[in-house]
Every structure is written in structure tokens, then in C-alpha cells.
Regions:
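N-terminal basic/disordered segments at the start of proteins
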Residues: 3-33, 45-58
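Gly/Ser/Thr-rich loops at beta-strand to alpha-helix junctions
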Residues: 16, 48-56, 77-82, 107-110, ...
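Active-site cofactor/substrate anionic-group-binding motifs, chiefly glycine-
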Residues: 62-111
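Short, acidic/small-residue loops that bind anionic groups at enzyme active sites
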Residues: 72-74, 128-139, 175-192, 207-211, ...
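Active-site histidine-anchored catalytic micro-motif
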Residues: 148-156, 161-213
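A conserved active-site cap/scaffold subdomain adjacent to cofactor or substrate pockets
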Residues: 182, 201-275
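Internal helical hairpin/lid segments
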Residues: 248-355
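Cysteine-cluster motifs in flexible loop/terminal segments that predominantly coordinate metals
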Residues: 340-400
């Protein structure tokens, strides 16, 4: 295993010669794409939809290697960042009432919109005596819940990558009945479609190509992104997470733009198949059903969330068990990503996470960034998770700046 990992690192991470060659190819294709071909003179905007891709791009300073007319933009790629604050308020309330709340470590400090004088996160609730337990996986929560009979709830946060474990544990009847499931699962393709449409409807600088997430694609399959070139004429590449993977994806996208032949390519062939994992997909479909879902800072997106099907929901759905009324599309307060005003319970005042998540703004455009909002004391959701764009920029943005200055 170690030798295999070393081979991958040498080929896709430490291969400076290949990286230099790819940069030259990128410069070649970018240089051929002129404003007459695009219809405008602004940069060629390529969007990715994965927090790990943003980490790779920023950590390794890949933006500093690109021509000035190529811009990499982070889209909705952080599942923790898009959990609406009303679910955080609900979790805080349950923990303080004695219910055991199981959560991933990334979500422990996820802030609600309450004043700092009140419990704004599960970490605050834990300090006040709330029953909050950090787990690494749903399996850990299942195992711990079996050791007691108390009411418990697991915050089921995540994109498609977490669904295999969620689905199989329910399918195999491994989940104890005292453990309820608060489904905060969000699906990437609907969010991708929503974001691209939003850019076009608002007349924003258009997205010219997409780097599709590799981890998600191992589950759902590369073919799920076919709608991007077919319906939106967007060159799309499913990419891995090493620097070479990303550079290869950029080069392929620019070539497709230059050739005027938008298509779907799978660069991450060492793990991604066109149909993903059919067995896993069948289990997921048997356990969950798609629903309208709220995305923090964005709004409601059709069929972008999952809830337990009735045969599982009767015993495990946290909304039903605790008598919680979920937010409906008509009730959800839209945020500044749409109308210029923060929602009453979604995004904290002055925070621009809604725009950052959609790639409309950069973290450095936010007046709170690295001032009243830092990784140590996050004010907005994008600063909390290691996959959040603001968190990544806060930790590694200076590295990229140094690389650009010494280029």
C-alpha cells in the first residue's frame, strides 16, 4: 500500500517536469482563446465544486502558475458550510435538553446567527453541559448509541461520498432505534445546475468550464455530469486531487474551449467509472428519496437533498420523532446571494459566505475575513470547515501570494 501511494505521489504530486509541461500547454491554449471567440475580454472562468480541489489549488499555489486570463473559482463544495443555521439551533436545543447529539468535528463550531452572548454552536452548547459527542463516522455513532438507551440524533451532513455508509447501515438494520437521523445530505449535480443557471440569469461573468469532483464521482459515476456539456455547452473534466490532476483538467478544458467542442472527460480514471458504483447506488435509492432542500446562503434547490424513505423514516427520521417541522420552499428566507440582504436566520450580519460559496465573491472580498472572522474564531460557516473556501484561504492563501510574488 505504501509503495502504491508513493507511486501516485511521484506521478501526480511531485512531478515537476510534467507540471511545467502542463503549464506550457495551458499557456498555449489560453493564448489562443481571444475575446472575439468568447465575446468579452474578461478572464476564462473555470469553476470546481469540491473543497478538496480548493485545498489543492490554494495549498500548492496553482493559481500562481496560470495565465492571467484563466481564473479558477470555487463553487458549492463544502457540505458543512451549506447547513442552514436553523438546524444548528435545533441541534443546540436538543443537546441542552439531554438528547445525545453526534456530529462530525468540522460541524462542532458551525455558527448559528445568534448573538455571541448566546450559544452559537454545538461547541458552545457542550461547554454549557449539552450532550454533544464528536464522531469520525456514522458507524462510530451507531456503535456508541448501542451502549445506552438515551434519545440520540446523528447530524447526517455530507455530499454523495458519505451516502454509502449511511445507506448500508440502514439497509443492514444496524442502526439502533434510539439513534435518530437528521438528514442534512446534499446532492452536488442539482447545486451545480443551480449555480450555472444563477450566473446566467444574473448576467455574471459566465462559467466557461467545470472541474467535477472526483470523490463524488466514485459513487454516482462520471456520466452524471453529462448534462453540463449537453445542456450548457460547458467543457467538463472529472479530476483527482493532486496538483497534476488539476492542471491536466485545466488543460483539457481550455483545449475543448479552443476547439469549440465541449465534452465530458474523466481524468480521474484510476478511481472513477462512468456508472460509479451500481451496487452502492441501488442501496442509496432503496433507503433515501430526493427532496427540496435548503442550502445555507443560497436558498432552496429542487431535489438536492435526501430524506429517509417511509419504511426507514418511521423509526429513524429525527424530524418525525422530535416533532420538528422542516423548512418548506415557501418559508425559507432567501439570502444575500439573491437579494442583497442577509436572511433572518441563515447568514450572520456582514458575512458574505453566501456569495463565497457560489463563487461570486472571494474570501478577501468579505470585510470580516481574517478580522472578526478567523479559523480560531469563525463568524461565518465558510471559515469553520477544512473544506470551506475561507478556511482554506486563511490557512494557505499567504503561501500562494508568496509563490506569485517570487514567480
Amino acid at each position: 500500500l505504501q509503495s502504491g501511494l508513493r507511486v501516485i505521489e511521484d506521478a501526480f504530486r511531485n512531478n515537476r517536469e510534467l507540471a511545467s509541461s502542463l503549464v506550457r500547454i495551458i499557456e498555449k491554449y489560453a493564448g489562443k482563446i481571444d475575446k472575439e471567440q468568447l465575446g468579452y475580454s474578461a478572464p476564462i472562468k473555470i469553476m470546481h465544486f469540491c473543497g478538496t480541489h480548493e485545498w489543492t489549488i490554494t495549498h500548492y499555489g496553482l493559481r500562481s502558475l496560470l495565465p492571467q486570463n484563466v481564473e479558477l473559482v470555487a463553487g458549492p463544495g463544502c457540505p458543512v458550510c451549506v447547513v442552514p443555521s436553523n438546524y444548528i439551533d435545533l441541534s443546540i436545543k436538543l443537546s441542552l435538553e439531554g438528547c445525545v447529539v453526534y456530529t462530525y468535528g468540522d460541524a462542532l463550531r458551525l455558527p448559528s446567527t445568534k448573538p455571541k452572548s448566546q450559544a452559537r454552536s454545538l461547541l458552545d452548547a457542550k461547554a454549557l453541559g449539552g450532550e454533544v459527542k464528536v464522531v469520525y463516522s456514522f458507524l462510530d455513532a451507531v456503535r456508541d448509541a448501542k451502549t445506552h438507551s438515551r434519545d440520540s440524533v446523528f447530524l447526517g451532513i455530507g455530499f454523495e461520498t458519505v451516502l454509502p455508509m449511511y445507506g448500508f447501515l440502514f439497509h443492514k438494520k444496524e442502526v439502533p432505534t434510539n439513534l435518530k437521523f437528521l438528514s442534512l445530505v446534499r446532492l452536488t449535480p442539482p447545486a451545480m445546475k443551480y449555480t450555472i443557471k444563477l450566473y446566467r440569469e444574473r448576467g455574471l461573468l459566465p462559467i466557461m468550464g467545470v472541474i467535477a469532483p472526483g470523490h463524488v464521482s466514485t459513487v454516482i459515476g462520471g456520466e452524471e455530469w453529462r448534462f453540463l456539456p449537453m445542456n450548457f455547452n460547458l467543457p467538463t473534466v472529472v479530476a483527482g486531487f493532486e496538483p497534476i490532476d488539476v492542471l491536466m483538467a485545466i488543460a483539457s478544458i481550455l483545449k475543448m474551449i479552443n476547439d469549440k467542442k465541449p465534452d465530458l472527460e474523466i481524468e480521474y480514471k484510476r478511481l472513477v467509472k462512468t456508472d460509479g458504483n451500481p451496487q452502492v447506488r441501488r442501496v442509496i435509492e432503496e433507503v433515501f428519496q430526493p427532496v427540496y432542500a435548503a442550502w445555507r446562503g443560497i436558498g432552496m434547490i429542487a431535489r438536492s437533498g435526501l430524506k429517509l424513505r417511509p419504511e426507514f423514516g418511521q423509526a429513524y427520521d429525527a424530524f418525525e420523532y422530535f416533532g420538528i417541522k422542516d423548512v418548506s420552499p415557501s418559508e425559507y428566507v432567501m439570502t444575500h446571494a439573491h437579494f442583497g440582504d442577509a436572511g433572518s436566520y441563515d447568514i450572520p450580519p456582514n458575512c458574505r459566505c453566501g456569495e463565497v460559496v457560489l463563487g461570486i465573491s472571494k474570501p478577501t472580498d468579505c470585510p470580516l475575513f481574517m478580522k472578526s472572522c478567523t479559523p480560531e474564531s469563525p463568524w461565518g460557516p465558510c471559515m469553520v470547515s477544512s473544506e470551506g473556501t475561507c478556511n482554506v484561504w486563511a490557512k494557505y492563501g499567504q503561501m500562494e501570494k508568496i509563490k506569485m510574488e517570487t514567480r
